[in-house]
Amino acid sequence: MKQCFLTTNGPKAIGPYSTAVISGKTVYLSGMIPADPATGKIVEGGIEAQATQVFENIGTVLGEMGLTLANALKATVFLTDLNDFAAVNAIYERYFGPDFPARSCVEVSRLPAGARVEVELICEKTEG
């Protein structure tokens, strides 16, 4: 049976979707954009600032569910410009290393709210 989860500390959804859906021990985290949780606006400062905010947001939401980035099995990274690939990789490595989840990265024409990066995760609960 699935359980829908809505964050109370991370950025609010900008559409009709759950922050995450839990099914058994699997957690499907919706795509996270670099929105400031307090304002809902995309952070300024370029791709590094945006990628950092995405992973901070993910950490906040996972923490609400008793999880960490170590629970991640698969990440999907969406970029509006593949020229940002190296910069995002450097930040990604700081948050996930050295036991990286499986990952895909794709370039897309646009992301919600003018974001340059979005990340979704599939995680595994190790307890309960």
Spans of model-derived segments:
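Short, polar/acidic, helix-capping and beta-turn segments at strand->helix junctions
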Residues: K2-G128
